[in-house]
Amino acid sequence: MRRWLLLMFMFLSVAAVAQPDRVYKSLKDVSDPEEVYILRLRGKRLKRIPPQVYGMTNLRELDLQGNRIASLSDSIVLLANLERLVLSRNPIDSLPPVMAGMEQLRELVLWSTRVTSLPKEFAVLDGTLELLDLRSCRLLLDEQEAIEALLPSVKKLWDYACNCPD
């Protein structure tokens, strides 16, 4: 009986540590970066991705909506297990070509950013990326067509093309 109780305690202890469903909303809450699977740093006035995020090797979802991030570092590829990246409502206007190496990326949310094109290297993501959200990005028709040609099998969310002057 004692042995069974000890085994149950050990099992429950391990299960309590690894919490893939836990959503972290502050870096202060993180004690072990390898235990972070979902990180939502919305509206934190960040100008860049904090360096400690790149050590979160098991990170599956990174939500940076509503910050002040204008560019991404090539270090973003260190997040090799990232499946969902949300950059909505940031003043970002381009993505680094090295992101084409993010083979696990399934969703890229760029809603209401300044992005109007993607690096040609992103063509390799056509078989793995499932959703590209470019709503409210003020894309011109030729910009939409270029993205469509680059990623033909990816589901895209965007507004009707606008040929409006700024």
Describe the function of each predicted region.
Residues 116-166:
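Leucine-rich solenoid repeat scaffolds
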Residues 4-13:
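Sec-dependent N-terminal signal peptides
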Residues 31-70:
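LRR N-terminal entry segment and analogous cap-like coil->beta motifs
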Residues 33-34, 54-58, 77-82, 100-105, ...:
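Leucine-rich repeat
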Residues 27, 49-52, 72-75, 95-98, ...:
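The feature encodes a structural signal of leucine-rich repeats
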Residues 43-44, 67, 90, 113, ...:
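Conserved "Asn-ladder"/turn position within leucine-rich repeats
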Residues 17-19:
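Boundary of Sec targeting at the N-terminus
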Residues 37-41, 62-64, 82-87, 105-110, ...:
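Conserved hydrophobic beta-strand positions in leucine-rich repeat
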